[in-house]
Structure formats: C-alpha cells, structure tokens
From Swiss-Prot:
Designated name of the protein: Adenosylcobinamide-GDP ribazoletransferase
Family to which the UniProt record says this protein belongs: Belongs to the CobS family.
Main EC class the enzyme belongs to: transferase
Cofactor(s) of this protein: Mg(2+)
Lineage per the UniProt record: Bacteria, Bacillati, Actinomycetota, Actinomycetes, Mycobacteriales
InterPro entries for this protein: CobS
Enzymatic reactions: alpha-ribazole + adenosylcob(III)inamide-GDP = adenosylcob(III)alamin + GMP + H(+); alpha-ribazole 5'-phosphate + adenosylcob(III)inamide-GDP = adenosylcob(III)alamin 5'-phosphate + GMP + H(+)
A Pfam family the protein falls into: CobS
Amino acid sequence: MSGKAYFVNGEHGPAIIEGPLTALNWLTILPVPSATAFDRVTGGRVMASVPFIGIVLGIVGGAIAFAATSLGVASIVAATVIVCFWELFTRFMHLDGLADVSDALGSYAPPARAREIIADPATGLIGMGACLISILIHISSFTALLDAHLWWMVMITPMIGRFCAIFGAHSRLKPMNPTGFGAMLIGTVKTHTIIAWLCVLLVICIGVPLAMDRGELITITILGLLCSVTLALVEIRHLHRRFEGMNGDTTGFIMHSATALCALVFAVGVGIVA
C-alpha cells in the first residue's frame, strides 16, 4: 500500500461523501469518483471510512454465504469463493501489506533496512507463508461457520477487521516517511472516530445475533471484537517501535491478521458452544 501516491493540492468536498467514495476508489476495484486533493485531510477521511469498506465487504460476503447455504453448496467451496472475492475486490492490497511487513519482521534487520524490505515489491518466503496461513485460517474458519449455518458471522468478520485497521493510523503514531501514501494516512485518525466506530461495531455484534434469534452467540461476537482489537494494539506497539513509524503496509498487516483472528475466534467459539 505504501508509496503509491504523493501529495497533490486540490479542493475538498463534503467529508461524509468524499471520505467513503475515496475509500472505495483507493481500496477497492470500484471505479467511483475520488477526491482531487491528495493530502492528510483526504487521508484522514479515507481512514475514517475504512470500516465502511468492511461493511460493504461484509454485506456482499454475507449474501454469498446465505445464498450458498440456501442452495446447499459445499461450505468449503462457498468459503473459498468469499475469501477470493474479498481479495479480488480489494486488489490484494491488504494481503500485499501482510506479506511485506511479515518479510520485514522476519528479517530481524535494523529499522532502516526493514523499511527497505517493506518497500521492496518482491515477496519472500516468510511473506508468502504469512499470506498462506492467513488465507487458510479464513477459509477453514468460514467453512466451520457455514457448516453451522452461521452465514451472518462471516458477514461480521471483515467489519471487525477493517475497524481494527484504523487504530494503526491513530493521531499518536508517526509515518515511516514524511512523503508518499503512508504520510497521508498515518496520524490522521482521532480518538473520537475510533470510539464512534466502536459503538457501531458493538451494535452490530449485539444486534445481528439478536435479529437472527441467536442471542446466546453475542458473547462470541463480542469476544471476537475484543480479541481482534487487542491483537491490533499489540501489533501497533511492536510495529511502531520496530520500524520507527507506520505506513500503508502496516495498516494492511493489521487488517488482515485481525480479520483472521476474528474468524478463528468465531469458529472456535461456535464449536465450543455447540
């Protein structure tokens, strides 16, 4: 995700429109109009809208899961289609961040060299291994959830993962590089934005199970949220210290790993309850 855009002056539109549309343009394959200005205002609006992208992914993934369950499609096939769709829809952007950061962490190199590894377009063995592990966790966990006819838990997973990503751009964090894509994003998310989205996620984690008449699973959805946020905070602390800053790739790393953990917690929790 890093190094793909540079600061450009321009005019801004209404935040409530510009933020989500630009997020869709930057982070998905949808050809929607985006902001003409490339600055930290735009970056902040995009990061504040990242959980909205999670909602879009969740709704589409949930629709695929529901249709597959209704039609009797094998759970592993449906789970694979959902994960592949998400990766294609987001241009593998976050998977790329997972690979780049994993390679840098696995190198045990000094911060300056680690940042060079992140910027290197080539992917090493550690990065490929991390991607494989994450994808396998996604598919196996979703298979278990679909076997239990809990398609709506698949829907919630990317919402939680995208929410966790915005912690990695909190105003207390600094970018690795003062220019480029990461500098537009890192340090732009305010605490009140995180709190607002946390309230939305809590409503989803409580309201959806109740709407599906599965109130006994609220504990699991809340636990998935808490575990994912905890993982994100631990990762942010380590990454910020390890690389002496954050960038777009670290955001993708946090997002992908938090989503994988959420899916795993959901699947294990449902298995225990069952």
